[in-house]
């Protein structure tokens, strides 16, 4: 796992979009976790999204899942040259989606407020994981957890 810095020319763009999505979700009254899927070849944004569990009464619309949903239908081969950006370490469900679609690279904004087993599992399956330790991501997530601990525990299945 790479920690601390941006490694690709699209990483800052991807993390900025993911954070914008997290902030939008928070403003809507949801969990502030955002994501973005970027094509590694040309930097095009294939999809972006944020956690919509509270807004839509959904059990599964985490930030990463919402991002993939907003990509629409893509050929399987498209995912093979992408990076998924997420503001928070992916949970088991989101890790499974990353593996299922063969997304080779995942850039994580922060893993202080939630440290899942997903990062390590992705690595064992051959996926690159980069944790950039983004202060914006840490701050908005901590603020949400402090304000709404029960909603946070519900979101992570506790």
UniProtKB/Swiss-Prot annotation:
<dbReference type="GO" id="GO:0004131">
    <property type="term" value="F:cytosine deaminase activity"/>
</dbReference>
<keyword id="KW-0378">Hydrolase</keyword>
<dbReference type="GO" id="GO:0005737">
    <property type="term" value="C:cytoplasm"/>
</dbReference>
<comment type="pathway">
    <text>Pyrimidine metabolism; UMP biosynthesis via salvage pathway; uracil from cytosine: step 1/1.</text>
</comment>
<dbReference type="GO" id="GO:0046087">
    <property type="term" value="P:cytidine metabolic process"/>
</dbReference>
<feature type="binding site">
    <location>
        <position position="155"/>
    </location>
    <ligand>
        <name>substrate</name>
    </ligand>
</feature>
<keyword id="KW-0963">Cytoplasm</keyword>
<dbReference type="InterPro" id="IPR016192">
    <property type="entry name" value="APOBEC/CMP_deaminase_Zn-bd"/>
</dbReference>
<dbReference type="GO" id="GO:0005634">
    <property type="term" value="C:nucleus"/>
</dbReference>
<dbReference type="GO" id="GO:0008835">
    <property type="term" value="F:diaminohydroxyphosphoribosylaminopyrimidine deaminase activity"/>
</dbReference>
<keyword id="KW-0479">Metal-binding</keyword>
<dbReference type="GO" id="GO:0044206">
    <property type="term" value="P:UMP salvage"/>
</dbReference>
<dbReference type="GO" id="GO:0019858">
    <property type="term" value="P:cytosine metabolic process"/>
</dbReference>
<comment type="function">
    <text>Catalyzes the hydrolytic deamination of cytosine to uracil or 5-methylcytosine to thymine. Is involved in the pyrimidine salvage pathway, which allows the cell to utilize cytosine for pyrimidine nucleotide synthesis.</text>
</comment>
<feature type="binding site">
    <location>
        <position position="62"/>
    </location>
    <ligand>
        <name>Zn(2+)</name>
    </ligand>
</feature>
<protein>
    <recommendedName>
        <fullName>Cytosine deaminase</fullName>
        <ecNumber>3.5.4.1</ecNumber>
    </recommendedName>
</protein>
<feature type="binding site">
    <location>
        <position position="91"/>
    </location>
    <ligand>
        <name>Zn(2+)</name>
    </ligand>
</feature>
<feature type="binding site">
    <location>
        <position position="51"/>
    </location>
    <ligand>
        <name>substrate</name>
    </ligand>
</feature>
<dbReference type="GO" id="GO:0008270">
    <property type="term" value="F:zinc ion binding"/>
</dbReference>
<keyword id="KW-0539">Nucleus</keyword>
<dbReference type="GO" id="GO:0008655">
    <property type="term" value="P:pyrimidine-containing compound salvage"/>
</dbReference>
<comment type="similarity">
    <text>Belongs to the cytidine and deoxycytidylate deaminase family.</text>
</comment>
<dbReference type="InterPro" id="IPR002125">
    <property type="entry name" value="CMP_dCMP_dom"/>
</dbReference>
<keyword id="KW-0862">Zinc</keyword>
<feature type="active site" description="Proton donor">
    <location>
        <position position="64"/>
    </location>
</feature>
<dbReference type="Pfam" id="PF00383">
    <property type="entry name" value="dCMP_cyt_deam_1"/>
</dbReference>
<feature type="domain" description="CMP/dCMP-type deaminase">
    <location>
        <begin position="9"/>
        <end position="129"/>
    </location>
</feature>
<comment type="subunit">
    <text>Homodimer.</text>
</comment>
<feature type="binding site">
    <location>
        <position position="94"/>
    </location>
    <ligand>
        <name>Zn(2+)</name>
    </ligand>
</feature>
<dbReference type="InterPro" id="IPR016193">
    <property type="entry name" value="Cytidine_deaminase-like"/>
</dbReference>
């Amino acid at each position: 796992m790479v920690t601390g810095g941006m490694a690709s020319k699209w990483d800052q763009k991807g993390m900025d979009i993911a954070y914008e999505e997290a902030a939008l979700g928070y403003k809507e009254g949801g969990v502030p976790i955002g994501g973005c899927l970027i094509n590694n070849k040309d930097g095009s944004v294939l999809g972006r999204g944020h956690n919509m569990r509270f807004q839509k009464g959904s059990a599964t619309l985490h930030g990463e899942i919402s991002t993939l949903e907003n990509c629409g239908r893509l050929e399987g081969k498209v995912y093979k040259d992408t990076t998924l950006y997420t503001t928070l370490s992916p949970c088991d469900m989101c890790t499974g989606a990353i593996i299922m679609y063969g997304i080779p690279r995942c850039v994580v904004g922060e893993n202080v407020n939630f440290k899942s087993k997903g990062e390590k599992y992705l690595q064992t399956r051959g996926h690159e994981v980069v944790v950039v330790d983004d202060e914006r991501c840490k701050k908005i997530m901590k603020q949400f957890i402090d304000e709404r601990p029960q909603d946070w525990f519900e979101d992570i299945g506790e």
